[in-house]
Swiss-Prot record:
Regulates independently canonical Wnt and Notch signaling by modulating LEF1 and Notch protein turnover. Stabilizes LEF1, a pivotal transcription factor in the Wnt signaling cascade, by blocking its ubiquitination. Involved in angiogenesis; involved in intersegmental vessel patterning during development. PANTHER family: MYOSIN BINDING SUBUNIT, ISOFORM O, PROTEIN PHOSPHATASE 1 REGULATORY SUBUNIT 12. It comes from the Eukaryota. Keywords: ANK repeat, Developmental protein, Notch signaling pathway, Repeat, Transcription, Transcription regulation. ANK repeats lie at residues 48-77, 81-110. Belongs to the NRARP family. GO terms for molecular function: chloroplast targeting sequence binding. SUPFAM superfamilies: Ankyrin repeat. One of its GO terms (biological process) is branching involved in blood vessel morphogenesis. The gene is nrarpa. SMART domains: ANK. PROSITE patterns: ANK_REP_REGION, ANK_REPEAT. This is Notch-regulated ankyrin repeat-containing protein A.
Length: 112
């Protein structure tokens, strides 16, 4: 493990949540690739009761949503208020994210 991996792994959830808040897809992609050796959960809830996916949907960041799903974010998880990523996207008027999440849900459930 490199020195960068060690510093990232020392507080992986905090580092991850901060990267999501920045919304920088390239930075987050690099971070996610480097955190594969860490005890790390892409579906963890932050202090506001949101997962990284929920936060990315709130921000309307489709690129980040796709990246998080690629790395295992569960689109079915509900936040503290009981809203899924799809609910948040629909309420926020993020039609591109709504369509993406519906498509992912359709294929992940095996529906045709």
């Amino acid at each position: 493990m490199s020195q960068a991996d060690i510093s990232t792994c020392s507080a992986p959830q905090r580092v991850f949540q901060e990267a999501v808040k920045k919304g920088n897809t390239k930075e987050l992609h690099s971070l996610l690739q480097n955190m594969t050796n860490c005890e790390f959960n892409v579906n963890s809830f932050g202090p506001e009761g949101q997962t990284a996916l929920h936060q990315s949907v709130i921000d309307g960041n489709l690129e980040l949503v796709k990246l998080l799903v690629k790395f295992g974010a569960d689109i079915r998880l509900a936040n503290r208020e009981g809203w899924s990523a799809l609910h948040i996207a629909a309420f926020g008027g993020h039609q591109d994210i709504v369509l993406y999440l519906i498509t992912k849900a359709k294929y992940s459930s095996g529906a045709r």
